[in-house]
Structures are given as structure tokens and as C-alpha cells.
């Protein structure tokens, strides 16, 4: 060893003239290449045959996907236009096109959609490599729960309808019993399929699957349109019959009387009470089917294929938000019960309208201030924006903005009617304030929810940071003690940053819980009760009976859907805070 150390160092080999020439040439070539690169653009590097062939296949696959989406979208558009033409013809020309004709068309569409749903479950999903990925963001539990709840209510609605038709079987056609039976079977199977497969990203039979999804979506959309228009016609006919009965009381006989008055009253009240849920069920099915259509042939990364880690739903010490929300809920239930009791009589006293609108005027500005405070806290946070492509979140935003147009449209029509007639009366001033505050509350709440949905959850960066640190440092450090010390240091740093953001998290959770309870209250009142927008008579006298009925019956279901969808979005904001 000593001899090896004391030995003289070997002299470095001298480069040969050829090597010098080669080295000089290479340096000259390199300088020349740099000059060419700086002066003029280099010619593109030629790709290999495999890379060119692979990119060509990818391009053809994208073109095939776009063609399939275009064709299925056109199919749905034509079906909706055909059904819309039938429904409009039924409204404006009741002699040539009757309600029975529309039912026949919808029954044919339901049977076709039913056959596709069964084939999708039995055939498509059981093929090899059919469902390689499942979208973790699609079909959250509140959407599937609402699907089952509203689907069950709609099935009960059709049972009440069949019972009512059976009690009048002596003056009604027996064929009319077939349509509710088909709808019951269709809704049961559709709810079951959507519950099981709403997260699927199908990779086989993509074009056929897209067409089936669009056909089912168009069928649900036409069911919603018919439910809204048929409800308005039913209310109009009922109001006209009541007026005729008051005018000609005791004169004439009704040939279609129920044989058992008590049973018919149960069927009629059950049908009227459950009717709003059918419109909500159709809207939710359309949203779920659209997400499934967007997920056809979609490929997800390995880490997004599984269910992401989610923060559990805990109160985290929130006090004021739940208390204020429960206070609004109790007050809303009291106002709702008083108004419903008064509405069961022949006329509603003016003071109950004042109480109803005064409750809204008190709650809506509080919700708007809470939304503005939450949006400001989002701006103060250090969380990054989540810019990844997410079809479910994009659909949530579109549905949130679109559903808000329902009640906002009614509010704008009310503002015009009040300002143009008698804006100085107390009730009219309350309705005017209610309409303005409703528009403001929708805008601020949409801003708060959309801002929260596009923020990364607070727990996500810490978990991923610790995992990346483990992956990087594990091969480098051999001591488990040093690794434990690093993990403890990372935990202390996370706890320190958590304590600094704690007040923001708590404020966001307080605001989210308060808004959740308020939206539940504002969802319950129009969904289960009488609509003051029609009963107060102001807008009805200004726009006319048929026009205002159409506006209300198209706007209110969207408003109910907006409140329910807002609750789901606020739950996501609460969990991500």
C-alpha cells in the first residue's frame, strides 16, 4: 500500500495530431451549429417510423371520438326537436295532437332507452377491458342519493296516478294505465343502472354507448318538458273548473265522479305533493347521463383512477355557522307551515304573503354577505388553483349557472311588473326587494362555490409533499432514525402552516355550513308548498294567466334544482377547506 502511494504519478497521455484535428473540427462544427441555430432555424428532427405511426393512430382516435360525439349529439338534438314539436302541437292545437299522442311517443323512447340500458349492463360492461377506469369525481354520494330519493318519489307518483285512473276507470280508457306502468319500469331500471355505472369510463363500443346515453338523456329531457307543461295545463284547467263550479253551483252534473271520495282524495293529494320531484329526477338524470357521455373512451392517470383521499365530514369546532343555519331553518319551517295552513283555505290573507316575503328579505342579504366574505377569504388564501381538466367539475359549474337562470328570470319579470304598476304598496315593495336580493344572492353564491371548487384542498399538498420526500430521500438515506427525524420535521412544518391557515379554514367551514342549511330551507319551501309567485296575483294580472303560468312553471323547477345542486357544491367546498 505504501509503495503504491509513493509511486510517481503517471504522466497524462499527449493527444495525437489526429485527435487534435478531430477535436478542433468538432469544436468548429459545434460553433458552426450554434451560429446556425442563432441565425436561422434548424430543420425539424426527423421522427422515427414508430413515432409517426403512433401519432397518426392517436390523431385518428381523436377524430373518431369527435365524430362519435357529434353524431350522438345530433341524434339527441333531433329527438328533442321531435318531442318538442309534439308537445308544442299539443299545447297550441289540442285537437290534432293530444296528450295521448305525446305519451305514445315517450313510451316508444322509454322502451328503446330501456333496451339500451339493459344491454349496457349485461353486454357492454362485461366485455374484456370494457371499463378500465372509473372517474372518482363523477356521481358523488349526494347525487346518487338524490337520484334514489327522487326516483322513489316519482315511482310513488305514478302509483298514485294509476290509483286515481283506476278509481275513474268507468270514464277513462284502460290504455291510459299502460303509460304509468312503463314509466315505473323505466325509472326503476334507469336508477339502478345509473347508481352502479355513473363512474364508468367505457373503452369498448364507444359510438353505440354514446348514442344510447344521448337517447336516454333526450328521453329524460322530454319527460321534464312534458311534466312542466302538463302541470301548467292541469293547474289552468283546475282553476277554470273551480270558477265554473262557483258560477254554476248546483247546476249540471259531472259524469266522471270518483266512486270512493276518500280514496280519490288521497290519490289526488299524493299526486300533487309528489309532482315536483318528477321534474327534479329528470334533471338529475340528464346531468348524470351527460357526465357518463363525456367519460366515454376517457383515459385517466394511474393516481386518479382510484378514489382520492378525502377529508372526512367533521364539524372541526364550527359553532356560529350551524347555529345561524339552524335558526334560519327553524324560522323557515314555521313560516312554511303557517303559509301552508292558510293556503289550504279558499283565500290567502295578505299578511301571510307579507310574512313569507319578509322572511326571504331577512335571509337573502345575510347569505349574500356570507358569500362575499367567503370569496374574499378565498382571495387571501395561498392555495393554488386546480387547473386540471375535470368534466364533472365543468358540468357542475354549467349546471350551477344554468339553473340560477330559473329564479333570476322570474325575479326580473316581477321587477318589471311591480315597477310598471304599483311600487309603493308594502307587499309590492317587499316583492321588489325580494327579487333584487334574490338576483344578488344567486350571483354571490355562484362566485363563492365556483371559486371553492377550483381550489386545491388544503390537505392535498401536504400529503403529496410528504410522499414525494419519502420517495426521493429513501434511497439516499440508509438510517431509519434520520428518516424518522425528517418526517417529524415535515410534520412540524405542516402543523405550523396549518395553524397559520386555521382561521381561514374555520371561517370557510362556518360560511359553508351556514349556506348549506339556508339552501336546504330555501329548497324545501318551493318544492313542497304553494307558490306565492302565482298566488299573489300581481304578476298574473300584469302578464296574463297563461304567460305567467308558463314563466313560473319553467323557472321554479330550475330554482329548486339550483338549491339542491348548491348544497352539493357547498359540501365539496366544505370538505376542501
UniProtKB/Swiss-Prot annotation:
Record keywords, A-Z: Cell membrane, Hydrogen ion transport, Ion channel, Ion transport, Membrane, Transmembrane, Transmembrane helix, Transport
Membrane topology: Multi-pass membrane protein
GO cellular component: membrane; plasma membrane
Start and end residues of each stretch annotated as Disordered: 1-46
Main location: membrane
Catalytic reaction(s) noted: H(+)(in) = H(+)(out)
Regulation: Activated by extracellular acidification. Activated by Zn(2+) under non-acidic conditions.
Protein name, UniProt field: Proton channel OTOP3
Gene designation: Otop3
